[in-house]
Amino acid sequence: MIDKKQSSENRRILRIAIPSIISNITVPLLGLIDVTIVGHLGSPAYIGAIAVGGMLFNIIYWIFGFLRMGTSGMTSQAYGQHDLNEITRLLLRSVGVGLFIALCLLILQYPILKLAFTLIQTTPEVEQLATTYFYICIWGAPATLGLYGFAGWFIGMQNSRFPMYIAITQNIVNIVASLSFVYLLDMKVAGVATGTLIAQYAGFFMAILLYMHYYSVLRKRIVWKEIIQKQAMYRFFQVNRDIFFRTLCLVVVTMFFTSAGAAQGEIVLAVNTLLMQLFTLFSYIMDGFAYAGEALAGRYIGAKNQTALRNTVHHLFYWGLGLSLIFTILYAIGGKEFLGLLTNDTSVINASDTYFYWALIIPLAGFSAFLWDGVFIGATATRQMLYSMLVASASFFGVYYAFHPLLGNHALWLAFLIYLSLRGVVQTFLGRQIMKKVIASQ
């Protein structure tokens, strides 16, 4: 009986995690496709323009990722409570807020770009091409931020297949549209940007169609005045405010890591960038299980099922520990060969030997932070998640500035690994208390 229960719980986790992992892997493909297309146009300025423009949108959309996470946690709890009215309101509330933020971005697009180019130094040609790319792609903000709401809502509804279908569709549309505009109409960077824009709206409208077809029964429960009910909106913004500041800390640490590496020279920057690809690859897998944590933790909290909640957390950590060990072994055996696929610059490959062992520690140091983030989002324990991020971020900068004069780039990696580990340690300490309080308050 116990084996059957464990098998059933593992199936629930994998049913959400595997499609989420596939979705995560497709995300960088949009940017990679754009770079590949312009990389054959005959000038490095095109690649630089896509790199700069892509970085701007990555930062902007990363900051507003709370729309997906907050919606996922609250929807999964409503799902566990079988509260169809609140489930319906949460989707419209999230998409509505996303569209409002997108409208603000459209209004402020000129000062945003001006500020960006005061912080980023590029050649005049790259700046001109990046400006073209930005002013086209910014019109995809409503689709992108609206889709964040849908993605979080689908996951909260225990359905990660729809976000996967949407992500795959976006990539196919982007490839076809961008190639057509660039090579048939000779639109160059403008063609790539237009292809990306069309792909974004294709994904958004596909989400609407999936909702209308498979969740049509919920449309009968729409009461517009209840969507902006004061108490519900307060909770919505309270949860998302904490996630926003948590994400801001994440962005600051990530950008500082790149900046600190760049300050130590081109070779160190290149080495750090390559080694971080090992972390990025691992994060795609762990994020899939974090999404499962969001959906299932919220569901069981909504259903007031503390036994199932505890069982899910245990199973998530079994998966996390097992996968971390596998990644550590794989990186130890073939990590350097993987780096060789990313670059043929022998000076960079040789320099990476000095810092490679830091990358080996990443999976074991970081897996618990990913999983607890998912559980905390499902529990809407976002204030505690923010506290853990603040502690970890402060430690990151403290360790770096304390040891950099002695250790150089090793201090940067030491600080990053302590930052990852502390997030997991603090959340582990808070996790049990939070679970009990959340269940008791339901």
Description of each model-found segment:
Residues 1-17, 75-142, 182-241, 297-362, ...:
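Short alpha-helical transmembrane segments in multi-pass integral membrane proteins
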Residues 47-107, 144-162, 271-333, 367-380, ...:
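Small-residue-rich hydrophobic transmembrane alpha-helices
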Residues 29-48, 117-124, 180-187, 248-281, ...:
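Helix-terminus/linker motif at the lipid-water interface of multi-pass membrane proteins
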Residues 5-41, 55-70, 74, 99-106, ...:
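N-terminal transmembrane alpha-helices
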Residues 20, 24, 36, 73, ...:
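Transmembrane alpha-helix boundary and packing residues in multipass membrane permease domains
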Residues 136-155, 163-174, 192-208, 287-290, ...:
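Short runs within selected transmembrane alpha-helices of multi-pass transporters and secretion channels
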Residues 40-43, 77, 156, 185, ...:
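Membrane-helix boundary and inter-helical linker elements of multi-pass secondary transporters
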Residues 15-34, 136, 169-170, 199-203, ...:
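Transmembrane helical elements of multi-pass membrane transporters/channels
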